[in-house]
Design a protein with these regions (language model features):
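Conserved PLP-enzyme active-site core in the AAT-like
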Residues: 1-210
Length: 210
């Protein structure tokens, strides 16, 4: 997961010492049974208390959760008293693959908070944090300021979003990126000495080279 390996410990730093616990899965996807095992592993005071499940759509390995997979995780999280966060840096690529409405793989599937990225689809900088449960957004503006996430010219970071979303450019760009990745994958599979490591379901291809 990106929050574990590629953020220099920032999530745990800004969460005042919160501990990230890792659950296993195949091809970058969290396994519901593994989530439950981590959540129920221990209940004593010496062990971190699970509070939220974070999943990435599309995943760090280029795979995509189907809507029913996210619904299963969402339902499990509710039973365990956990919230659900989605890292959507490549959400548009996942939507282009699935051909569904955004709601089907976010709030209707049990996602509470979405980090919606657009830099993979043409925007220079910035992400949108979407709270489907508004209670979780309490004083979020203050936390953004403390974390250095309030740009002095925030309007310039925000301006491209309506154009990208209303005009359909985000999905068009995502489809194009997925198509290019599929073309690359096909070329790689034609070379016997190269091996594609994971199913290519979005715009990422992972290859083992000699």
């Amino acid at each position: 997961a990106h929050i574990e390996t590629d953020e220099c410990g920032a999530p745990e730093f800004f969460w005042n010492g919160t501990k990230i616990l890792l659950a296993q899965g195949k091809n970058g996807k969290l396994d519901p049974a593994a989530i439950e095992e981590v959540a129920r592993r221990r209940t004593d005071i010496h062990y971190p208390k699970p509070r939220v499940v974070s999943l990435t759509q599309a995943t760090e390995l280029g795979t995509v959760y189907a809507a029913e997979e996210i619904r299963e995780i969402g339902a499990l999280a509710r039973r365990l008293g956990l919230r659900v966060h989605m890292d959507g840096a490549r959400l548009c690529n996942a939507l282009a693959t699935l051909g569904c409405a955004p709601a089907e793989i976010t709030w209707r599937a049990g996602v509470d908070t979405l980090c919606f990225g657009m830099t993979k689809n043409g925007i220079l900088a910035g992400e949108a944090v979407v709270f489907f449960d508004r209670e979780l957004a309490q004083e979020f503006d203050y936390r953004c300021k403390q974390a250095g996430q309030l740009a002095s010219k925030m309007r310039f970071l925000s301006a491209p979003w309506p154009v990208m979303l209303r005009g359909g450019a985000a999905l068009r760009n995502a489809r194009r990126a997925n198509e290019c990745a599929a073309r690359l994958e096909a070329g790689i599979r034609a070379l016997a000495e190269l091996k594609v490591l994971h199913p290519r379901e979005a715009n990422s291809v992972f290859v083992e080279m000699p």
